[in-house]
Amino acid sequence: MLSRKGIIPEEYVLTRLAEDPAEPRYRARERRARFVSKKGNCNVAHKNIREQGRFLQDVFTTLVDLKWTHTLLIFTMSFLCSWLLFAMVWWLIAFAHGDLAPGEGAAVPCVTSIHSFSSAFLFSIEVQVTIGFGGRMVTEECPLAILILIVQNIVGLMINAIMLGCIFMKTAQAHRRAETLIFSKHAVIALRQGRLCFMLRVGDLRKSMIISATIHMQVVRKTTSPEGEVVPLHQVDIPMENGVGGNSIFLVAPLIIHHVIDANSPLYDLAPSDLHHHQDLEIIVILEGVVETTGITTQARTSYLADEILWGQRFVPIVAEEDGRYSVDYSKFGNTVKVPTPLCTARQLDEDRSLLDALTLTSARGPLRKRSVPVAKAKPKFSISPDSLS
């Protein structure tokens, strides 16, 4: 029986049907783990924390950071435990005063209508949540019962205050507002005013504005110091420009934030080939500001890996003037178009400006036009001579 390898050429094997046989085969490089996800979550797992008690020193923040199921479970258990604890206290008071045996006890009980632990538990719930059915009440017979009544009311108010505060903070957290702050899926590198620039687009879907909005950008990459120390997450700040100078932005409409790649930029030696080979590079973008309606500071984050940066492309315009006002077409928010861009690093472009001149000359000529071929006039099938008219 003939083997499959002998009758089927290698370029038509199933494993290579989607490949080009003329190109060499490369081993797929494992993609670098993100430090910040596209949605802004930090991809960090904390392990082997020895001092767990530090979380209990800030109980309120710990409760707010917990999941909803855990938070509601803790408050439910807090109410049940407090009711059971004070029910035991009320039962002990009634037992010590002899109120559990009405025939043999005192004439005036400490708490009326308590004859068992069940009735003591019901009275504990009535006291703490101020239901007030009226069937059970504390009398003047036992000063200790009056003191326990005051303590249970204070404990109930404290639990209610903490619960309401946690629920309010969890529903009004800053990251809820950040859900409507959007970034472009890809970043681009193209020429702007003769310089290579790293650009991205940011927008706000809500009509309520972000006050004092600022934007920051950092490059995170793995580096090695001259002494041989390996820094897995080396963070370098890079300046952003938005047309008005500084990091402050007026985010009333989508903006294109750009960073000029100059000699002080960590992207100065970045080449187009580095983007295709998944270079160990991540650019983190942080947008921060104050919510106009609530006054809470919010922060939106995203990141771009090397393969999410498009070289030689530019964002399409999405803001147009219609009927006396500006309209934004968010369906084109992340759309880009190709533009002439030198395939070299910013360092090479600064050292050899002729690359830019050649690119400008090529773009000035424009695309090749189809050569017009003159069309020969067709000869008439018959002609009229002057002699035939005479």
Swiss-Prot record:
Modification Phosphoserine occurs at: S385
Mode of membrane association: Multi-pass membrane protein
Domain of life: Eukaryota
Residues annotated as binding a 1,2-diacyl-sn-glycero-3-phospho-(1D-myo-inositol-4,5-bisphosphate): R176
Disulfide cross-links: C110-C142
Site positions (Role in the control of polyamine-mediated channel gating and in the blocking by intracellular magnesium): N160
GO biological process, alphabetically ordered: potassium ion import across plasma membrane; regulation of monoatomic ion transmembrane transport
Subcellular location: Membrane
PTM description: Phosphorylation by MAPK1 results in changes in channel gating that destabilize the closed states and reduce the ATP sensitivity.
Its job: Inward rectifier potassium channel that forms the pore of ATP-sensitive potassium channels (KATP), regulating potassium permeability as a function of cytoplasmic ATP and ADP concentrations in many different cells. Inward rectifier potassium channels are characterized by a greater tendency to allow potassium to flow into the cell rather than out of it. Their voltage dependence is regulated by the concentration of extracellular potassium; as external potassium is raised, the voltage range of the channel opening shifts to more positive voltages.
Similarity remark: Belongs to the inward rectifier-type potassium channel (TC 1.A.2.1) family. KCNJ11 subfamily.
Domain note: There are two PtdIns(4,5)P2 binding sites: A canonical site where the phosphate groups of one PtdIns(4,5)P2 molecule are coordinated at least by residues Lys-67, Trp-68 and Arg-176; a non-canonical site where the second PtdIns(4,5)P2 molecule is coordinated by both KCNJ11 and ABCC8/SUR1 residues.
Descriptive protein name: ATP-sensitive inward rectifier potassium channel 11
Provenance organism: Oryctolagus cuniculus (Rabbit)
